[in-house]
């Protein structure tokens, strides 16, 4: 037998050993959904907790298995700018990857969209869960992670295309391997996400050269109307990503919402969905078993959210995701 044939046989065995999930298997324990909350130690994250997130999820039948945050080391605290963002993402990745792939619904309470690579890295490097039976070699194969990116901005800019120069406007490009491989590797995201694994949702404000990049990379898109009507396009995209990937991360920048609910954001764009409309769409999305995590970023709080509308909206979105998981059979 040739070396190639032997190697092929090994990989066939490994692939056959990987688990085939039933639609109701993930995160369900005696009829309850096990949730792991991961927090950037930023006031926006803490303010969402203070808005009653935990109680609202337990009222929907969830068990909060973990509720964790992290601190930068003294050495890491010396860094600023892009380097610091990468280190923060690495800590987020470490918290998420410590969980088994089928053990928890991950709820990531993030500072800004710069935390995106950390969540993706954590899901990519998440090991097999306790119920999975795999050969030890297969456990080292990175998970294929899909991304649904709800944001009024595509965040597909690179330093060559951006008008603003904002690092937080480049995180999808970084995740796709379009620039700054050093920061991506610091976060542990390796390999980068292929463009076919990425779905841009409700993008309404882009830079001209960013649009050229989106078109060249052929990113898939769903519109505001798709979200409001829960159109067939949403189903088609979920089926497509479910076939391509092992787990799907749903990322939400709160500026995706109607400006009336996030007036303190600073980067709002007109004609966004209400939080209830998006929560209803998330309920549909999370009925698909590959939907493994939801992340909430850039939530206005304190004086920028005097009536608590933004924080209540954030809680509403996570509730929508949990309702979807509850509908899995």
Annotate each predicted stretch with a short phrase.
Residues 1-5:
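N-terminal secretory signal peptides that target proteins for export/translocation
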Residues 6-20:
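Cleavable N-terminal signal peptides of Sec/SRP-targeted secreted and luminal proteins
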Residues 22-24:
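Signal peptide processing junction and immediate N-terminal pro/mature segment
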Residues 26-329:
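Conserved alpha-helical scaffold segments that buttress catalytic/binding sites
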């Amino acid at each position: 037998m040739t070396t190639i044939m032997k190697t092929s046989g090994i990989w066939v065995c490994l692939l056959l050993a990987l688990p085939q999930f039933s639609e109701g298997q993930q995160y369900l324990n005696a009829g309850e959904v096990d949730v792991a909350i991961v927090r950037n130690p930023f006031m926006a994250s803490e303010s969402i907790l203070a808005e009653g997130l935990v109680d609202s999820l337990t009222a929907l039948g969830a068990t909060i298995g973990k509720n964790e945050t992290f601190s930068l080391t003294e050495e890491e605290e010396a860094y600023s700018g892009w380097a610091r963002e990468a280190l923060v993402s690495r800590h987020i990745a470490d918290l998420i990857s410590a969980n088994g792939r089928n053990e928890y619904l991950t709820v990531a309470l993030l500072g800004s969209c710069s935390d995106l690579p950390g969540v993706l890295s954590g899901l990519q490097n998440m090991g097999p869960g306790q119920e999975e039976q795999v050969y030890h070699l297969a456990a080292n194969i990175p998970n294929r992670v899909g991304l649904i990116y709800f944001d009024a901005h595509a965040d597909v800019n690179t330093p060559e295309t951006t008008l603003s120069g904002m690092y937080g406007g480049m995180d999808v490009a970084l995740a796709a391997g379009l620039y700054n491989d050093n920061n991506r590797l610091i976060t542990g995201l390796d390999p980068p996400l292929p463009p076919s694994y990425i779905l841009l949702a409700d993008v309404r404000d882009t830079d001209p050269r960013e649009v050229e990049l989106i078109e060249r990379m052929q990113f898939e898109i769903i519109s505001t109307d798709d979200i409001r009507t829960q159109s067939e396009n949403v189903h088609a995209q979920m089926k497509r990503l479910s076939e391509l990937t092992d787990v799907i991360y749903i990322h939400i920048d709160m500026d995706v919402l109607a400006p009336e609910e996030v007036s303190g954001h600073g980067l709002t764009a007109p004609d966004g969905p209400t939080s209830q409309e998006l929560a209803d769409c998330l309920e549909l999305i999370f009925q698909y078993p590959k939907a493994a995590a939801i992340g909430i970023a850039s939530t206005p709080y304190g004086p920028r959210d005097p009536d608590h509308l933004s924080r209540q909206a954030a809680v509403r979105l996570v509730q929508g995701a949990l309702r979807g998981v509850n509908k899995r059979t």
